[in-house]
Amino acid sequence: SRSTEQDKNMVRVGDEIAKQLEAAGIGVIHDTTLHDYPSYNGAYERSAETIQKYLDEYPSIKITIDVHRDAIEESDGTRIAPVAEIDGKKAAQIMIISGCDDGTMNMPNWPDNLRFAAAFQSQMEADYPGLTRPIFFCYRLYNMNKTPGSLLLEFGAHGNSLEEAVYSGELCGKALTELILSQGE
């Protein structure tokens, strides 16, 4: 269920990703602002302001990741929990969302984001087969115009447990660390 307690929501998943990157010496800014509270309306506009504030202060930022969970259910309302078993534990499957532009969205860097999405998914699948769902490639902005490495990640869905999502955050962070270090960034 939805919570504003940061140790019980997607902020906790972001904590896990940040922990893995920081352990490898990769600089991280993990903003824990709940942009969708108290209302989903305007959440992307509020998060765009936050991202821009950091980009103005730290123009060398190359990657921005927006951490979410999906909301998928059966036609009868049963919540779906996409999982993979990784090293004997249930992990919430991760879906990468990468937007594209039809010329109306001011997102000239979308091909860079898509390449990053494909490389990131390949790294996660090489390390943890079955962890990812197919990339969702769509005409949506979701603040992906901010950096050439801007993605939205869905950690499972509202049917998954927090523990499954947090474990996926750990695995995701390890794979992202490996990808960044392999590219010499």
Describe each model-derived feature in a short phrase.
Residues 24-27, 59-63, 92-93, 130-131, ...:
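Loop/turn elements at helix/coil->beta-strand transitions in domains of secreted/extracellular proteins
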Residues 132-185:
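Active-site-adjacent mobile loop/cap segments within catalytic or ligand-binding domains
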Residues 1-3, 30-33, 92, 96-106:
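Acidic/histidine-rich, surface-exposed loop or edge segments in extracytoplasmic proteins
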Residues 51, 57-101:
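Active-site microenvironments of hydrolase-like enzyme catalytic domains
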Residues 28-30, 63-66, 95-97, 134, ...:
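Structural recognition of the beta-strand scaffold that forms the well-ordered cores
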Residues 34-38, 69-74, 101-104, 140-143, ...:
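Solvent-exposed loop/turn segments at secondary-structure junctions
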Residues 1-62, 71-76, 170, 183:
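N-terminal catalytic or cofactor-binding beta/alpha core of small enzyme domains
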Residues 109-136:
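Active-site-adjacent substrate-binding region
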